[in-house]
Amino acid sequence: MEEPNAAPLPSRLARLLSALFYGTCSFLIVLVNKALLTTYGFPSPIVLGIGQMATTIMILYVFKLNKIIHFPDFDKKIPGKLFPLPLLYVGNHISGLSSTSKLSLPMFTVLRKFTIPFTLLLEAIILGTQYSLNIILSVLAIVLGAFIAAGSDLTFNLEGYVFVFLNDIFTAANGVYTKQKMDPKELGKYGVLFYNACFMLIPTVIISVSTGDFQQATEFRHWKNVLFIIQFLLSCLLGFLLMYSTALCSYYNSALTTAVVGAIKNVSVAYIGMLVGGDYIFSLLNFIGLNICMAGGLRYSFLTLSSQLKPKQPVDEESIPLDLKS
């Protein structure tokens, strides 16, 4: 495998399209999962996650067999190369489920924004990435805007705070280590996705069975409903696309950019909620905070896309037509 001395930087278009791809997938899966879990009342979110992991494994394996993509065959070194991603995934999942049930939605949204500064900090520590003062101020503006938006709902729940901050740390660490592990000389982005899903599938099935989640899924009354099955399969496909687009966005940009795109998506959903749906309750403080959040996110996007000082990127030796065309 030959490596040139100077690895080409990804184009501005590649960085932009990968970020838009991630934002779109993240938005769509929220809509589909909301329909499944709320409208249909599907009682088993863990089973839904299992379906998404199984779909990821099947799609990537079929693509590998047909030589559309490449990633290393399994050997005894793979677990060491992937560590600690599976553990971070479990921690992220458990802390996320625990925190959502103990905090109000506005406060949960605020505290989840701390994923962004945690990501910035971990990128500096683990990857050695340095950011300008303007980038740091843009990140702080997003967090400040989130606090202002939820200013009327600053409830305190120590257990909830602990879980959500753990969730932030696990999410940030997962993004940064995913970025680190995607070196084409090692696992590459497809190898990271495939083996992470493989290692997590069996433990997740065990958790689902032991908690009664799997039994609830088998007893669900809508399995003969064609529309439900279509949406369930769509959620599984979108789960794969979300994992893929997250890796792609982190690969061409950074884990920090991926976190900021997620924040911009959340604010965009709030804006849409003002116009349609009827469940947005207007308050001046909330509206001001949302605008500060969006301004910080857009400022970050402008600075990132216009910057000429980009961190080194590994040569993408696994480029396939699926990249940026999904």
From Swiss-Prot:
Topological domain (Cytoplasmic) residues are 37-41, 152-155, 211-225, 277-280
What membrane topology does the UniProt entry give? Multi-pass membrane protein
What is this protein identified as? Nucleotide sugar transporter SLC35D2
Functional summary from the UniProt entry = Nucleotide sugar antiporter transporting UDP-N-acetylglucosamine (UDP-GlcNAc) and UDP-glucose (UDP-Glc) from the cytosol into the lumen of the Golgi in exchange of UMP. By supplying UDP-N-acetylglucosamine, a donor substrate to heparan sulfate synthases, probably takes part in the synthesis of these glycoconjugates.
Q: Does the keyword Transmembrane helix apply?
A: yes
Mapped to this chain, the residue ranges on the Extracellular side of the membrane are 1-15, 63-130, 177-189, 247-253, 304-326
Q: Where in the cell is it found?
A: Golgi apparatus membrane
Q: What is its main location?
A: Golgi
Q: Which family does it belong to?
A: Belongs to the TPT transporter family. SLC35D subfamily.
Show the catalytic activity: UMP(out) + UDP-N-acetyl-alpha-D-glucosamine(in) = UMP(in) + UDP-N-acetyl-alpha-D-glucosamine(out); UMP(out) + UDP-alpha-D-glucose(in) = UMP(in) + UDP-alpha-D-glucose(out)
Any one GO BP annotation for this protein = heparan sulfate proteoglycan biosynthetic process
TM helices/strands, residue ranges: 16-36, 42-62, 131-151, 156-176, 190-210, 226-246, 254-276, 281-303
Keyword match tRNA processing? no
Per the record, its GO cellular-component terms are: Golgi apparatus; Golgi membrane
Q: Which GO terms describe its molecular function?
A: antiporter activity; nucleotide-sugar transmembrane transporter activity; UDP-glucose transmembrane transporter activity; UDP-N-acetylglucosamine transmembrane transporter activity
Assigned keywords, A-Z: Antiport, Golgi apparatus, Membrane, Sugar transport, Transmembrane, Transmembrane helix, Transport
> What taxonomic classification does the UniProt entry list for its organism?
Eukaryota, Metazoa, Chordata, Craniata, Vertebrata
Report the superkingdom from the record. Eukaryota
